[in-house]
Amino acid sequence: MATALSLAAVTACGGTGSGASDPNSVTVYSADGLGTWYETQFEAFTEQTGITVNYVEGGSGEVLSRAEKERSNPQMDVLITLPPFIQRADDQKLLAPTKDADGSTDANYVALANNYFAMIRGTGVAPAPQTWNDLLDPRFAQKLQYSTPGQAGDGTAMLLLLQHVMGEQQGLDYLGALQANNVGPPASTGKLGPKVAKGELSVANSDVQMALAAIAADKAAYEVFFPAGADGVRTTVALPYFMGQAASAPHAANAGKLIDFLMSVPVQQTLAEQVYGTSPRADVNATGPQAAAITKALDGVTIWEPDWTAVNARFDALIDAYNQATGQ
């Protein structure tokens, strides 16, 4: 969870602008990870429509929290975040029917880009950890960190994955044991990659899209891995970026135009090349070296897709149990 939200329209989209008071603008609240893609696409959207995009970035739970606090004075037009936070937003009546790629408005949010939970390890860490049990090794004391379940999408995914792989109580017990090595709650998942790259950390959590994009752009000295369970199986969680139109959007028409634009085939086709994401659209197939890197990263990994509505229904109990198990 970021300690502060940065409210700034992407420079290419016309500056910080006039926000919700400008009828020719649209305000997006988004979890971090897609910033470079947004910069390119928001600029193209502004050139095409004349609508300025004001962009607010934060942790997955933080952008939702901001929207909740602004309920009496809505500023947000579009929310983009990871599960289960988009489901929580829907449950709290913060979202309106949102058009999907087929033009249907049966749901209040749509998948914008596919993504998957991952761990990252420094390229100089030897021997490289391969299993969840390896991460309990004392050599990782104060050299391991993960984002906070209940506040970060990737951190929440890690909790759910461990309970899925090990069993509900066993997963909690594991996280309790992992506290001996854990540095503590970070500002956000996005803050962890640079720490691993610099050697301040040996291991951290991340996701495939964010990690591969950073490795390519910054030559970050870490690599993606998926720890194996006791049975030797490597498993990840499908963790899409979801997008929904705000129920009280100050610029509902502009929000609809931006959603249509981002879900269009030409824009969806840029996900892999520009930011190592893949499209949820059945009629968009990623190709090229970036798509190959995504496929290679996930080779041999079992992808688990939780019932996010069910997760949301027991969200508070899950986080309470986590806090109790880890003494937080």
Predicted region positions:
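Bacterial signal peptide processing site
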Residues: G14-G17
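Extracytoplasmic ligand-binding site segments that recognize negatively charged/polar headgroups
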Residues: Y29-E39, S60-L64, E68, P74-L201, ...
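A ligand-binding cleft/hinge motif common to bilobed small-molecule-binding domains
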Residues: P83-D91, S202-E223, V275-Y276
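A bilobed periplasmic-binding-protein/Venus flytrap-type ligand-binding module shared by bacterial periplasmic
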Residues: A118-V125, L160, A238-A252, T270-Q274
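An extracytoplasmic/periplasmic, membrane-proximal ligand-sensing/linker region
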Residues: Q169-Q170, G277-Q328
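Mature extracytoplasmic/periplasmic domains
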Residues: A246-T302
